[in-house]
């Protein structure tokens, strides 16, 4: 027979599990989230370890993660940490805001390389992302070179921007471009990369 104490403990556990669905995280800005949770992997960083937002990066990252700002265009020099900022913002959207997002690289091969050398090590080294990736390190339909589908249901795509088909049939809230100046100005005669994704947030 089940004792009253065990029955009470089981009930309390079931109630606690059920209430998790109602838990709302304390809202954080992009920079607050990144300084608390984001880590740079050794494979693709000059200074691996815990991320610390530099003063000039604060406004950029907070603009990228702000729901009231629909488009962010950044003209930059080399070596300002843009790719790492972009990854931090993507991680923020995935874990903190539960947003489906799509990151474009200039070509399909560049997108696959980016997924392998930047995204996968970032998932591994950011504990709150790894918690959402039970498939990490093994073959799984939610773990491909074009899509990472997290246990929260959030999807992250990384695709090449040279093929018009990559702009279709993706239900995402956020679209980011890395190295936009390297994209074809007219994607297979269907329009510019940013016009093909019009109506969504752009970074």
Segments the model singles out, each with a brief description of its role:
Residues 1-200:
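Phosphate/NTP-binding elements of NTP-utilizing enzymes
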């Amino acid at each position: 027979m089940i004792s009253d104490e065990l029955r009470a403990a089981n009930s309390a556990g079931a109630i606690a599990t059920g209430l998790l669905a109602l838990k709302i995280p304390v809202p954080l800005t992009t920079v607050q989230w990144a300084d608390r949770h984001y880590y740079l992997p050794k494979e693709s960083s000059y200074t691996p370890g815990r991320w610390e937002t530099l003063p000039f990066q604060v406004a950029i990252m907070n603009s990228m993660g702000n729901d009231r700002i629909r488009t962010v265009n950044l003209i930059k020099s080399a070596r300002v940490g843009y790719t790492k900022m972009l990854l931090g913002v993507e991680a923020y959207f995935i874990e903190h805001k539960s947003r489906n997002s799509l990151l474009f690289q200039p070509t399909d091969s560049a997108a696959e390389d980016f997924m392998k050398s930047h995204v996968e090590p970032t998932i591994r080294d950011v504990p709150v992302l790894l918690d959402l990736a039970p498939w990490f390190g093994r073959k799984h339909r939610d773990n491909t070179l074009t899509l990472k589908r997290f246990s929260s249901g959030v999807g992250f795509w990384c695709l090449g921007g040279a093929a018009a088909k990559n702009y279709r049939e993706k239900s995402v809230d956020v679209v980011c471009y890395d190295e936009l100046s390297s994209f074809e100005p007219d994607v297979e005669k269907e329009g510019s990369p940013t016009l093909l994704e019009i109506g969504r947030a752009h970074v």
